[in-house]
Each structure stands twice: as C-alpha cells, then as structure tokens.
C-alpha cells in the first residue's frame, strides 16, 4: 500500500503535464520582452500589465502545446524530449492539440476585449508563425530554421508596444530585431550541445549541416551585429547612459563567452555558459531600457 502511494506521487499529474506543455521557463523570458516595452512607452496600469501577462502566457503556452503536438514524432527520438506528455504516453495527441488551440483562442479574446485588435492580431500572428512557419516547415527543412524562425520569438515586444500605444512604430520594430538577432546564437549554443539528439530526429540544425566551427563563427558574427544594434538608439537619443553601459557590458560578456567557445578544445562547458547567460542577457537588456527611461530619462 505504501509503495503504491509513493509510486502514484512520483508520477506526473495531469496538472503538471498541462503546465509542462506550455513550457513556463521559456514563457517567463517572453513575458519580460512583452512587458518591458510597455514601460518604455509609458506608464501602464497594473490591470493592463496583468492582462498582458495572462494573455501572453496563454498565447505562448498554446503555441508551445501545439508545437509538441506537431513534433510528437521527433520527440520520441530525442532524449531531452521523450519524457514529454505525448511521447511518454501520458496524454493523447488530440487532447494536447485541443488544449493548445483553446489557450490561443482564450488569449486572442482577452487581448481583443481588453486591449485592442492590433494587439490580438500581432499575438495571433506570432502564434501562427511559430506553429506553421517554424515548427511545421523551417525546423525540418533548413539549417536556417532558427534564423528565420527566430521571428516568432520577436513578436512579444510588438504585442506589448501595441497594447500600450495602439500602434507599431520604429521603436517597436527595433525591439523586434534585437530579439531576432539574439535568437540564432542563443539556440546554436544549445544545438552544439544537443547535436546528436537533433541528428537522431533528422533535424538539420546548423552544427550538423555547416559543422561546429562554422556554427561558432556564425555565432560570433550574430553577436557582433547584436551589440551594434543594441547601442544604435543611443546615438539618436532614444536611450541614455544607463542603457548604453548595460548594453556594452552585457554584450561584451556574451561575445567573450562565444569567442571562448571557439578557442577551447572542450567547449561543452563554455557553450552551456553561453546558452544560460544569453537568457539572462536578454532579460537584463530589456530591464535596462526601462530603468534608463524611468530613472535616467
């Protein structure tokens, strides 16, 4: 009896599986890049921020759930994904699809009802881009999957800006491109570490197609472009000293980490450090924008 109870407690619950489908760790960063632009644009009320957090989680969670539905065949072949709800047999594929669509539908209604139609449309566009353009098409066909598909993760700043201003201007587009150029080196660091897994699933990630050295060189170039892009608005007076110092320090640390990956013979630890720090980098960069605008401005 005791053994049965212990076994039941050790097995994932339905609630835990539903949360797993949404990929909450990934969503937390997306929410930072959604909310921060709102504070750069003005002073959003707590209710609007709450709506954006809830709606953003629902939309991104829905996209992630549908992603797991579409990737159920390759998830069974990869060690890091085979324990997900569908490949492990804990949930039916159709139930996961219905769950994902329901979350996205709820998010669309929430945005349209309590913000504006543009916000809902942009959020839904990000959903469709991630699900169909990236997951269904690019991921399985080209090593440029992350380069082009990275646009999906760059929609949240547009959504946050539109919720606050009702428009998408050059500032919002600038935020979009920061995330866009940040994405490839971030995911290529993971691809270097998990390339055998991707190989088993026949996913043409950059290290498998271009080779490790070329992937590392591409990571350096993308980081150089990213640094140049992050400091650009300072020359136009959009941000001040606080943001400039943050962008240079954070960008310098990230670039140094990527260069270190290319210099050491065993780059496993260095690649992990780049992958983890890149997450912190993006969050801190967007926070620095807010601090600069509210304190320095």
Spans of features found by a protein language model:
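Intramembrane alpha-helical segments
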Residues: 93, 97-164
């Amino acid at each position: 009896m005791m053994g049965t109870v212990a076994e039941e407690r050790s097995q994932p619950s339905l609630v835990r599986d539903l949360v797993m489908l949404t990929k909450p760790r990934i969503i937390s960063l997306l929410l930072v890049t959604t909310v921060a632009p709102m504070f750069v644009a003005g002073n959003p009320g707590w209710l609007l921020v709450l709506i954006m957090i809830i709606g953003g989680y629902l939309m991104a969670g829905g996209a992630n759930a549908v992603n797991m539905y579409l990737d159920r065949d390759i998830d069974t072949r990869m060690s890091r994904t085979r324990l997900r709800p569908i490949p492990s047999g804990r949930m039916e594929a159709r139930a996961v699809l219905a769950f994902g669509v329901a979350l996205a539908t709820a998010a669309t209604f929430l945005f349209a009802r309590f913000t504006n139609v543009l916000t809902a449309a942009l959020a839904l566009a990000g959903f469709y881009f991630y699900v169909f353009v990236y997951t269904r098409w690019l991921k399985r066909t080209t090593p440029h999957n992350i380069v082009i598909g990275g646009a999906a993760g760059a929609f949240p700043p547009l959504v946050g800006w539109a919720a606050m201003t009702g428009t998408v201007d050059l500032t919002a587009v600038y935020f979009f491109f920061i995330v866009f150029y940040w994405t490839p080196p971030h995911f290529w660091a993971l691809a270097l570490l998990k390339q055998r897994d991707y190989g088993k699933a026949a996913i043409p990630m950059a290290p498998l197609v271009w080779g490790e050295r070329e992937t590392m060189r591409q990571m350096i170039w993308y980081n150089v472009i990213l640094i140049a892009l992050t400091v650009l608005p300072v020359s136009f007076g959009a941000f001040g000293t606080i943001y400039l110092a943050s962008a240079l320090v954070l960008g310098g640390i990230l670039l140094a980490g990527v260069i270190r990956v290319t210099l050491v013979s065993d780059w496993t630890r260095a690649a992990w450090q780049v992958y983890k720090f890149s997450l912190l980098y993006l969050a801190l960069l967007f926070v620095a924008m807010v601090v600069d605008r509210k304190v320095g401005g």
